[in-house]
Amino acid sequence: MAIIHPKVRGFICTTTHPKGCELNVRDQIEATRKLGVREDGPKKVLVIGASSGYGLAARITAAFGFKADTLGVFFEKPGTETKAGTAGWYNAAAFDKFAKAEGLYSKSINGDAFSDEARAKVIELIKNEMGGQVDLVIYSLASPVRKLPQTGEVIRSALKPIGQPYKSTAIDTNKDTIIEASIEPATEQEIADTVTVMGGQDWELWIDALNAAGVLAPQARTVAFSYIGSDITWPIYWHGALGKAKQDLDETAQRLAGKVGGSANVAVLKSVVTQASSAIPVMPLYLSMVFKIMQEKGVHEGTQDQLDRMFRDRMYRADGSPAELDEKGRLRLDDWELRDDVQGACKALWPQVTTENLFELTDYAGYKKQFLNLFGFERADVNYDEDVATEVKFDCVEL
């Protein structure tokens, strides 16, 4: 038991609130339920990277929107009797509790999703507990490091531009001030390493392993998540080291299309507040602006809204028609964010933002609240001065 308040260092909140995290998951489930349950979608789903952000949202949509049995893989720190674990641990525990209450199969694996050991365990569980095959594989890993399964070598990714230093207005999120951020360009080695960590190699290793074991259903589909953004963030993102990794993901999808019976696609999603996006310089300012503009235009979506739309309006359409894809074969869920009127308003606003008018011109207050929400804080229905149980156990295999 402990009384837990937020402690923020840089772009990480080092504390988490178990009750707040559970209520976050409950809210996401309720949002999905409101759209009604469909019987004509995925039935057995594997989510790699299932404990937060878009991966968690995909798992919720599959289970509570389509009654699917789900197996989730993630790397989180469990809470102990005296110390809170990571937010993802409590998210996964809450998902498991609600799914089981609904009579759905739910199992989780806590371990390194880049490892062969994780793949072997997943295959064993699919064979023994899920009827032998899965019909959807969601790949949603966002990690700064990857340990290569063959050699044990640890590779690190770099959030850097390519070619020249990147200078831009940004928010110092510790001081709530506008600063000029400058980031030196990535070396060739850093670019290659970023592709190794964040590109499609591991996604392909997963599909190859599942294929070899015969645990993919004849019409199995697989989707990996990506972000492209607009030219505001391109220097650090799409034209940076991370963009090279995401282009590798696109090429991987083309190859995987020949390896699965259904389809293999990259889904390009909108920018949302996640632990992953907070780490990208310039993103907090861009997010604060784009949220305000999209809310004003009535097209704002959260993480769960995006995945609900991806499943219902793209992948599993009620009329059975195939999803439209862009010229690279991608599912585009960033269509509303990239509308000319939205991006035009962002570009007009960008040079006007100062420390003095930051809270007035943008939804930075909303950004900060959503950031703390990720860790279970800033909820009106939680008393943060009360003791909360930090040790939460659930149906999870520890690797």
Swiss-Prot record:
Substrate binds at Y227. Pathway: Lipid metabolism; fatty acid biosynthesis. It catalyses: a 2,3-saturated acyl-[ACP] + NAD(+) = a (2E)-enoyl-[ACP] + NADH + H(+). Its EC number is 1.3.1.9. GO terms for molecular function: enoyl-[acyl-carrier-protein] reductase (NADH) activity; NAD binding; trans-2-enoyl-CoA reductase (NADH) activity. The record marks E76 as: Plays an important role in discriminating NADH against NADPH. The active site is at Y237 (proton donor). It holds the Pfam family Eno-Rase_NADH_b. It is an enzyme of class 1 (oxidoreductase). NAD(+) binds at residues 49-54, 75-76, 112-113, 141-142, 246, 272-274. Keywords: Fatty acid biosynthesis, Fatty acid metabolism, Lipid biosynthesis, Lipid metabolism, NAD, Oxidoreductase. GO terms for biological process: fatty acid biosynthetic process. NCBIfam families: EnoyACPredFabV (NF043048), PRK13656.1 (NF010177). Belongs to the TER reductase family. Involved in the final reduction of the elongation cycle of fatty acid synthesis (FAS II). Catalyzes the reduction of a carbon-carbon double bond in an enoyl moiety that is covalently linked to an acyl carrier protein (ACP). Monomer. This is Enoyl-[acyl-carrier-protein] reductase [NADH]. It comes from Pseudomonas putida (strain W619). The lineage of its organism: Bacteria, Pseudomonadati, Pseudomonadota, Gammaproteobacteria, Pseudomonadales. The gene is fabV.
